[in-house]
């Protein structure tokens, strides 16, 4: 694996000079191998190690290199044709392959090659970009978008129209992460490498970026870039210091543990916030 990483790192340093016409065989094979490993879930751009999320920047570099080494080509879909550098993940799938891998894909859902989809996942008409990892039992609902290299945990529900940001550039940025057992409400956006920790519930229409204040109304604490585990979050506003205006924020209205979450439905958690 180290040899593969070395090839990618070296090629990335000279990426400006690489084209589909002049790319060498070693680089092309290394990039294609990484994309295949991401596609199968054998590798992932970010993973939790000893309780901390670690981003493997060289894998992101491989994804970016894939755009340098490939020309656009006509790509056939179920009801459309495309013209792009990245093939569609399911282009060669037959019924036996879908049965073996154990997930559902509802037309016209689109998944790029290099994204991993785990068993018991349901993809409604949605979009999953290259490098993303969608774990077991997750629902990606209609018109939801999972951005490049985003990490989606087990038993997550991404509601209709949710946007999970992709982060390929700048390379020092970390991917957006939704941990296990989270619910993201309709039309919410989580971007810029924000981490929504395990068991959190994000209400409809909440927007979370690195500069968004995430205010805990019980403690007065303000978080940036991270929703603490078990949080129930709604849209809100905080007043300016001079009291002349207010600015958007996200508000943690309560905390729930796994036991409470198991007994109470998502809708109930969001309705009883007073």
UniProtKB/Swiss-Prot annotation:
Family: Belongs to the transferase hexapeptide repeat family.
Pathway: Amino-acid biosynthesis; L-lysine biosynthesis via DAP pathway; LL-2,6-diaminopimelate from (S)-tetrahydrodipicolinate (succinylase route): step 1/3
GO molecular function, one term: nucleotidyltransferase activity
CDD domains for this protein: LbH_THP_succinylT
Reaction equation(s) it catalyzes: (S)-2,3,4,5-tetrahydrodipicolinate + succinyl-CoA + H2O = (S)-2-succinylamino-6-oxoheptanedioate + CoA
Entry's localization field: Cytoplasm
Keywords per UniProt: Acyltransferase, Amino-acid biosynthesis, Cytoplasm, Diaminopimelate biosynthesis, Lysine biosynthesis, Repeat, Transferase
Main location as per UniProt: cytoplasm
Protein name: 2,3,4,5-tetrahydropyridine-2,6-dicarboxylate N-succinyltransferase
EC category: transferase
Gene3D superfamilies: Hexapeptide repeat proteins, Tetrahydrodipicolinate-N-succinyltransferase, N-terminal domain
Organism, as annotated: Klebsiella pneumoniae subsp. pneumoniae (strain ATCC 700721 / MGH 78578)
Residues the entry annotates as binding substrate: 104, 141
Top-level taxon: Bacteria
HAMAP family membership: DapD
GO CC terms, sorted: cytoplasm
EC number(s) given by UniProt: 2.3.1.117
PROSITE patterns: HEXAPEP_TRANSFERASES
Oligomeric form and interacting partners: Homotrimer.
GO biological process, one term: lysine biosynthetic process via diaminopimelate
């Amino acid at each position: 694996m180290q040899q593969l990483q070395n090839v990618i790192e070296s090629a990335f340093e000279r990426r400006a000079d690489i084209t589909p016409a002049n790319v060498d065989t070693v680089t092309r094979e290394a990039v294609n191998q990484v994309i295949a490993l991401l596609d199968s879930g054998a590798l992932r751009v970010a993973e939790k190690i000893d309780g901390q999320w670690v981003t493997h920047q060289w894998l992101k570099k491989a994804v970016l290199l894939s755009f340098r080494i490939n020309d656009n080509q006509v790509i056939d879909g179920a009801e459309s044709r495309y013209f792009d550098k990245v093939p569609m993940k399911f282009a060669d799938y037959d019924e036996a392959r879908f049965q073996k891998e154990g997930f559902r894909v509802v037309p016209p859902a689109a998944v790029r090659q290099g994204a991993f989809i785990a068993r018991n996942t349901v993809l409604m008409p949605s979009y999953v970009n290259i490098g993303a990892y969608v774990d077991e039992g997750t629902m990606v609902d209609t018109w939801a978008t999972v951005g490049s290299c985003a990490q989606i945990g087990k038993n997550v529900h991404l509601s209709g129209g949710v946007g999970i940001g992709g982060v390929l550039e700048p390379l020092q940025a970390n991917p957006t992460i939704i941990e296990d057992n989270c619910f993201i409400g309709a039309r919410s956006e989580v971007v810029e490498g924000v981490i929504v920790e395990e068991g959190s519930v994000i209400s409809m229409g909440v927007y979370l970026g690195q500069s968004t204040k995430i205010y805990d109304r019980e403690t007065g604490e303000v978080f940036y870039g991270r929703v603490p585990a078990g949080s129930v979050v709604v849209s809100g506003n905080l007043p300016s210091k001079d009291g002349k205006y207010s600015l958007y924020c996200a508000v943690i209205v309560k905390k729930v543990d796994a036991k409470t979450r198991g007994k109470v439905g998502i809708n109930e958690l969001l309705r009883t916030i007073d």
